[in-house]
Structures are given as C-alpha cells and as structure tokens.
Amino acid sequence: MKLKNKLAVVTGVSKGIGLATVKALLEKGVIVAGWGRTEPEIENPNFHFFQVDVGNFEQVNAAWKATSSKLDMPCHILVNNAGLGYESTFEEMEIGLWEEMFRTNVHGLFYCSKVIIPQMKVMEAGHIVNIASIAGTTGIEGMAGYCGTKFAVRGISQSMFKELRKSGIKVTTINPGSVNTNFFDPIESVNANENMMRAEDVAESIIYVLQTSENYHPVELEVRPLRPKGK
C-alpha cells in the first residue's frame, strides 16, 4: 500500500509502541487518528487525537463517528495496539485486573475492528494490524491473564484474516518480544532495559507490513531482540 495521504486509526497512542507507530506513520505522510485515554505531545497537523477507552463499545463507536465526521475520508489502516498486562499467579489474580486486561486487549480489538471493517468492505481495501505478543505463543509463569488475552488476539486475527481476505482486506498479527517501554512498570519480575527492542523497532515492522504490495499478505510476524541478555 502507498501510505501517503491515507488515513490510519491507531489505538493506545499515549506512549510506547502506539506513540512510536504514530510518529512513524506521520513521517510517511499518513493522516493519523490517534485513539487513547491520554493525549500525547505531538505537534503535527496530520495528527488528530480522540479520547476513548477502547474497552467501552459506546466510546469506540462515538470515536469512530467523530473521526469520520472531522476527517471526512476513508480509513485504510487500523492498528489495534492498545493493551496492558498485570503480573500475578493464576490463583491470586484479582478479578478486576483480569477483566481489565480482557476488556482492553481483546474486547477493544473487537470493538475497533467492528466499527471500521464495514467501511473497508465498501472500498474492498484496507489493512488491519493487530499487536499480539510472544506471550500469545507460549505460556509464561505469573502472566496467565496477559497470555490468555494475547492467545485470544492471535486466534481472532487468524479468523479475521480468513474472513476478510475475500473482501480485499489484509489482517496482520505482529508478535513482539520484550520491548523497552513502561509496559513493564507494574510487572515486578521484569525491568525494562536497553537489551530489549525499542518501540521504534516494532513501529518499523508495522510500516513494513503496511507497505507490502497489493497481492502480498504478511499474515503473522514475530519480532524479537537479537541479544535479550546483552553480549
């Protein structure tokens, strides 16, 4: 896809991978609608922020209507990035935290995709990028809830791919390994460090899959740091 002057909706833009993705898209000339809880400090006429909790369908639907009304152009790109994780044994996990993870990581992906897919189907074009995790490929001790959400993201994405390809819509899942962001702030057993990937590395992966040719469909991409424990 040629990215310049296309509209992208990116969720979870306040920090980390979402913020890096917004900046990378803006550098490519993309008009970006950023959906999130807190507005990032971005001064660019092509960036438009819409405050939304993606785990709330009414807010997502309202954000999509506001985006469509303000920008008045079709959406070719959706990056479902919003996500969070909490560390706890399965037995001791608080119900509220469990529900929050599934509401944001899984329901949010469903809600955002649900409101935007119909318009992509009309165009018979579009690309949805779902950010999963290597935690969606193998269980991790103390991270059952988070792993559960990311396994769900991968399964949902595989079904979306099979359903939407016939409508000319690409669906790509990206599974990052450890990334040096504040995602790890509530996780006591892991400290973010320079041996991890940068958020910008994941953003580059997103740009790569978006720029593939029309009949080239990257379905799933796993990216990891080369030396996670240093030299």
Regions found by a protein language model. Give the residues of each.
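Substrate-binding pocket helix/loop in short-chain dehydrogenase/reductase
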Residues: T89-F90, L97-E99
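Conserved glycine-rich cofactor-binding loop
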Residues: L7, S14-K15
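Active-site helix of classical SDR
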Residues: S113, T149
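The beta1-alpha1 cofactor-binding region of Rossmann-like NAD(H)/NADP(H)-dependent oxidoreductases
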Residues: V52-A62, I95
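Residue(s) in the substrate-gating loop at a strand-loop-helix junction
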Residues: S133
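Alpha-helical segment proximal to the catalytic Tyr-Lys
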Residues: P118, Q158, K162-K166
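C-terminal helical subdomain
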Residues: I169, T173-I174, T181, S189-K231
